[in-house]
């Protein structure tokens, strides 16, 4: 099993690194070269800045039984058919039962932005958010 992480704007990098090191799990952060991630080079793959370049890199390499951590619902929908476990940065599991809801939310937000309707900005990430993500990741890895 490899844990692939869509690294651009990933707020849970230290948590993922810590858990993977403690459990000796292979992980790979994928990012474009405009982002400077604090991960070992052996666990980092840098792609060009083209649109969706990191997404296609992940989708082409991820395999049955692997794990993906991303907030990109388009990417999540591409890999779910490969029997991949997908987790977002909030610790929510993305699966075939709920991907349509996440994609619809993305669609609505996109339409609102096109009409210059902007919701309030995201709340600042809290320690509780990080703890929720960590617990979700550990529960999935432990098979619960």
Placement of each model-derived feature along the sequence:
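Nuclease catalytic cores that cleave nucleic-acid phosphodiester bonds
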Residues: 2-144
């Amino acid at each position: 099993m490899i844990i692939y992480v869509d690294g651009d704007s990933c707020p849970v990098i230290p948590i993922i690194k810590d858990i993977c090191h403690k459990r000796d799990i292979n992980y790979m952060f994928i990012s474009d070269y405009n982002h400077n991630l604090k991960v070992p080079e052996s666990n980092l793959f840098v792609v060009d800045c083209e649109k969706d370049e990191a997404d296609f890199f992940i989708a082409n390499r991820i395999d049955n039984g692997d794990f993906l951590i991303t907030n990109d619902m388009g990417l999540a929908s591409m890999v779910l058919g490969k029997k991949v476990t997908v987790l977002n940065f909030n610790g929510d599991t993305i699966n075939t039962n709920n991907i349509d809801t996440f994609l619809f939310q993305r669609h609505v937000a996109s339409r609102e932005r096109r009409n210059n309707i902007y919701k309030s900005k995201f709340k600042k990430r809290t320690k509780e958010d990080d703890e929720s993500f960590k617990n979700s990741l550990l529960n999935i890895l432990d098979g619960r």
